[in-house]
Amino acid sequence: TIMTDATGHPPITIDHLAVMGNIESGFKAVRVTSFEAHGPELNVNGNALIGAADGRDGLKLEIIAKQSNALSLLAFWPSFLVPEVRSYLGQSIIGGSATEASYRLDLDPSGLRAVIAKDVIPDNAVALDLNFTNGTLQPDKGLPTLKKMEGKVHVTGQKVSIDILGGTIDSGNGRVLTITDGTYRVFDTSLIPTVADINFHFAGAANDFATVLRSDMMRDISTPPLDPEKTSGNVTMAVKIGFPQKPDLKPSDIQVSAEGDLTDLTVENAFGAESLENGVVHVSASPQGLLIKGEGKLAGAPAKFDMHQQNGATTRDANVVMTIDETVREKKGIKTAGLVNGPVTLSFSLKGIGGKRVKGKGELDLTKASINGLIPGWTRPAGKSEKANFSIVISPDESISLDDLIIDDPSIYLKGKAEIGSDGVLRSVNLANLRINATDKVSASLEKAGIGYKISIQGDTLDGRALIKSALSS
């Protein structure tokens, strides 16, 4: 039985067809001593024995092929042999060449009865081996095309094995990832539909990887949120995919696991308006969700981070720790020279990234920094433990609200909130309570006014000596 028209493949051209054989005495068997089928893309020879002869009974078939089109050879794959796999490959293979192939079938009467009943045939009754080159495969209409595939196929009565020796993943627009090795397995052909188990390793550019993730099928599966136009770097990845071989696959039918690394990674607007540079990131994806851990420069500051997305969720959670020193502050236009000396550590945990509103908690660790007049009268030496805690809300326009901002230390006490614009510029600070000296009972506010800020202080008691000293020294 040749491949049906349902596959959409063109007919096979055969220029030479010859069959030689004889009928055994008593009409007990038909022996095909030679079978030849040759054409522009086909070079097949074979023999067969049907019936009782040579001390056996049943069907025995042998086919040898060389330098033939893969689709043409697929037409000689008997329809009763793992039909689901045959149908899947017939619809998925676009092109390729078989350098050599052999097919041997040996069915006794019980095996023939299994074929007639459409039951599973004995595993050792079939041996199909094929070496292929320059193969093109479309695993599913929603997945990227595999091209330039090199490998070998081995099929038995109950198992299918394909070893991939190399190839590429074509993500479109000239973007490709290199497949270094891989396997395709069907461990039990008795299942309906049969289940494919695929493992492969690939390497390439991070922006090409991001393009693959945006294919129709993959973007519905938990994957790293990368924009190809804003991503650069390198990627190496090991991927495992399992799915039933049936028409009209859905994302929920596909089980994907992946483990790999992105290096020298740059992602524009990785966290809001801030970019990640020189990133080294480990990615782990499973049916349970996605975990990303890495380090690099975020907003120009050395940072470590992790991000998690549960399977089926549309938002992600993240933890970030950044070290902000004088150089980073200067680049970001934060004028603290002489007021803050030494690095400060900013850490925050965010929930709901990718949603309409992101919320979280933050902490600013001042332990390694000395302060001299950042707020008039506030001084502290480096090495003394001091932390500021706050809650975070990031709005859709990427403006940031810092609420419940608290610093409680013998050198200062403040409680209030702050607003940072989508451009990263501090817009306002409102302190419901501010104490620099023991007798202070005031509130304070800071508002952006042109190129500077307007400061207001109200309250019952304020030791103004620090303010006057600060004003005279400025």
Where are these regions (language model features)?
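Membrane-proximal interfacial segments on either side of biological membranes
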Residues: T1-L17, I23-V30, L42-I169, G174-D403, ...
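A short, well-structured beta->alpha microelement
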Residues: I407-S411
